[in-house]
């Protein structure tokens, strides 16, 4: 069941979008996406992330506080505005609707695919947009690609006691 509210999603031409094929089930990938406190482990552009509510399952209306990796950056409050269990988690900035982070898991038989879209405004007119594209947005795009490789490693890692010494 799709649970959503607010305006229909408008995709910005400036949004960063990356995807990664996963050799794991969509359920395992979505479980990892829903573990907000673990986001800094695989999202390398974040220093911290935490939920503001009681810690129940992530759902529509849940609030998440994120701090980026830029030194001196303040914490930003986001709200889950779209949630489709097993498939979509979409965050929108609580104070700026132009700040958005979307996670989508696509099922492909025994494999899956994660698609992440990050969008934020660039202020300062044409010059500010140009400077942002040459500096911060380029770095963020590279970090997003690295982050999805980290996610792939975490979600595909299967270590049981019998697997530890399997090579010996």
Predicted features and spans:
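Short phosphate-engaging motifs
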Residues: 25, 38, 72, 97, ...
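Hydrophobic ligand-binding cavity/cleft-lining segments
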Residues: 1-54
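Glycine-rich portal/gate segments that line the openings of hydrophobic small-molecule binding cavities
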Residues: 3, 41, 50-100, 108-109, ...
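Beta-strand/loop substructures that line and gate deep hydrophobic ligand-binding cavities in soluble
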Residues: 92-146, 162-165
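Generic structural detector for well-ordered beta-strands
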Residues: 19-23, 79, 104
């Amino acid at each position: 069941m799709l649970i959503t509210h607010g305006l229909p999603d408008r995709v910005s031409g400036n949004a960063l979008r990356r995807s990664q094929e996963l050799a794991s089930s969509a359920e395992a990938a979505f479980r990892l996406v829903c573990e907000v406190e673990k986001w800094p482990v695989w999202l390398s552009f974040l220093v911290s992330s935490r939920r503001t509510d009681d810690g129940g399952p992530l759902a529509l209306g849940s609030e998440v506080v994120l701090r980026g990796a830029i030194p001196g950056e303040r914490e930003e409050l986001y709200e889950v505005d779209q949630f489709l269990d097993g498939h979509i988690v979409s965050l929108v900035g609580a104070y700026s609707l132009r700040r958005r982070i979307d996670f989508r898991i696509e099922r492909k038989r025994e494999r899956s695919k994660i698609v992440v879209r990050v969008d934020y405004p660039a202020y300062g007119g044409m010059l500010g947009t140009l400077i942002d594209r040459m500096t911060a947005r380029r770095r963020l795009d590279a970090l997003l690609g690295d982050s999805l490789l980290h996610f792939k490693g975490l979600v595909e890692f299967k270590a049981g006691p019998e697997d530890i010494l399997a090579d010996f």
